[in-house]
A protein has these predicted regions:
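Mature N-terminal, pre-catalytic/accessory segment of carbohydrate-active enzymes
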Residues: 15-16, 26
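Conserved, mostly hydrophobic/aromatic
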Residues: 14, 77
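Active-site mouth loops of central-metabolism enzymes
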Residues: 56-73, 105-108
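Glycine-rich, proline-tolerant flexible connector loops at the mouths of alpha/beta enzymes
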Residues: 41, 84-115, 131-134
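Flexible inter-domain linker/hinge segments
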Residues: 32-54
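Conserved helix-loop functional segments at active or binding sites
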Residues: 123-131
Length: 134
């Protein structure tokens, strides 16, 4: 696709999608297309999770979630019927950080702690999905 087509498509998405309602941007669609380059990196799990959560927020009265520190906890929560998983900053600070230390709940733990926790949770959910689709 050309940069012009990409910018036109992005502009239409911003105008038509309820996801972007009320957002004011100090930049143009052309600037976004120019800065992001020609290769679109796809983060499938993040996109699917964000789309599902957005849909839940707009269709469910309440979206119940419990904190999960491990992949197994996340799998059990989903198997129990929860539709969302919460990654608690307090849990990361207290016991789930990559330094293996205990920190106060002030985001003082190593910066890679939450991404590593999410990676473990995603890996467990992916493996469970693979097992159930064999």
């Amino acid at each position: 696709m050309s940069n012009r087509n990409d910018a036109d498509q992005l502009r239409r998405d911003w105008a038509d999608s309820p996801r972007w309602a009320g957002i004011t941007r100090p930049y143009s669609a052309e600037e976004v297309v120019r800065l992001r380059g020609s290769v679109q990196v796809e983060h499938t799990l993040a996109r699917l999770g964000a789309e599902k959560f957005w849909r839940l927020l707009h269709t469910e009265k309440v979206v119940a979630a419990l904190g999960a520190m491990t992949g197994n906890q996340a799998v059990e929560e989903i198997q129990a019927g929860l539709k969302a998983i919460y990654c608690s900053g307090w849990q990361v600070a207290g016991d789930g950080n990559s330094a293996g230390e205990m920190y106060p709940d002030q985001s003082l733990y190593p910066v890679d702690s939450v991404p590593k926790m999410v990676e473990r949770i995603n890996n467990a959910l992916l493996r469970t999905d693979q097992i159930h689709h064999m």
